[in-house]
Amino acid sequence: MPVIVIHQYLLIEFMLIFFRIIAMIVILPFIGSSAVPGWAKIGLAFFMSLIVYPLIIKTQILPHLPLPMVILSIISQVLIGIIFGFLVLIIFTGVEVAGQLISVQVGFGMISLLNPLISNQQVSLVSNLLNYLALIIFIETSAFFFVIEGIYNSFQTIPLTFINFSPYIFKYLELKAGDIFLIGINLSIPIILVAILLNIIIALMGRIAPQFNIFAVGFPIIIVVGLLMLYISVPYFTDYIMMSFSGLKLEFNRLINLTAYHG
């Protein structure tokens, strides 16, 4: 079995750092989208690796690694990076789900636009608006620095040769995936409740006054009220999204601890 000789250690350590960072970058919204060229992602990952490498080299000392272990370590670094990016993606996906739910209720369900931030697929108009709002908050607040801090702290605790993913980690990710629907419901529930109440009122009016044309009058009313509720709800959307991003630091630390103590 071939063994990596000592003069290759520096290259292998840098390579493992790079793979963890690049895997996280390609998962992150906007930065990881197809709108950003591949060379820019690779360049950013390379630059971040150059910064991280001298800071952690003293704490990450690689043993003699056979080639199969190097390959397994690369795969594990990619998985760790994907998991970190996934924690951020959960919030943006939850925001997109909220937009889809709102669009259906306010009559915009048939209007779709390309979403370059996450999936590069057609999503509803409201989903696009909320995703751009989330991106602005992500950039304007310290959320992006939470991501950088989280991936840096992971190098302090999670070894570059880490390959043991325990069931605790996957259970944690399963629970976090449920946050997509939680965020979507919490963001959209005020407008959904108003839309349901408005539909009930319009239905009662059609029942009481049969000459009342529900489709000619009711549909425009739903759209106008929906737009008004969207405008009124912007501060609520902003506060909730900011609260979700503020929890990233805690989630990164929780993931690092789970990996360190149960890995």
Question: Across the structure, where does each feature detected by a protein language model lie?
Answer:
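Hydrophobic alpha-helical segments and their helix-loop boundaries in membrane
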Residues: M1-G263
